[in-house]
Amino acid sequence: MEQALKQARLAFDKNEVPVGVVIVCRLNQKIIVSSHNNIEEKKNPLCHAEIIAINTACNLISSKNLNDYDIYVTLEPCAMCASAISHSRLKRLFYGASDSKHGAVESNLRYFNSNSCFYRPEIYSGILSEHSRFLMQEFFQRIRSAID
């Protein structure tokens, strides 16, 4: 999760919502992909950290199934990202801070408990959540102060 937090800080420095991700091979515990939100730079609402990481990992291993991999995310995934995690069959999802507004794992939609869920990973929440939460608060305070 510390590496995912480093990615979130990179996003923060680029004025992106500070969400970071790493995908880790379960067999050797090596990070195969790291990413962060890139929506503003790419001018593309699909460039969430999780989507970028999953796409890169699938291309890297030439497979749509990531069942030998885990994903670490600094913020609870939204519905789009939860669906991508499900469809790529990532074995385990570890995330930091909950997202009471857009979270789709345990906060709002609870995608993995829905009938439309394709596959449910093992889910572990609250990992270094205070660090993720602080970074998000700092980011949005900066945004609000720029508006004022």
Swiss-Prot record:
GO terms for biological process: tRNA wobble adenosine to inosine editing. Keywords: Hydrolase, Metal-binding, tRNA processing, Zinc. Zn(2+) binds at residues 48, 78, 81. InterPro entries: APOBEC/CMP_deaminase_Zn-bd, CMP_dCMP_dom, Cytidine_deaminase-like, tRNA_aden_deaminase. The keyword tRNA processing applies. The active site is at 50 (proton donor). Its EC number is 3.5.4.33. Its cofactor is Zn(2+). It catalyses: adenosine(34) in tRNA + H2O + H(+) = inosine(34) in tRNA + NH4(+). Binds 1 zinc ion per subunit. Residues 1-116 form the CMP/dCMP-type deaminase domain. It holds the Pfam family MafB19-deam. GO terms for molecular function: tRNA-specific adenosine-34 deaminase activity; zinc ion binding. Gene3D superfamilies: Cytidine Deaminase, domain 2 (3.40.140.10). Disulfide bonds: none annotated. Homodimer. Catalyzes the deamination of adenosine to inosine at the wobble position 34 of tRNA(Arg2). Belongs to the cytidine and deoxycytidylate deaminase family. This is tRNA-specific adenosine deaminase. The lineage of its organism: Bacteria, Pseudomonadati, Pseudomonadota, Alphaproteobacteria, Rickettsiales.
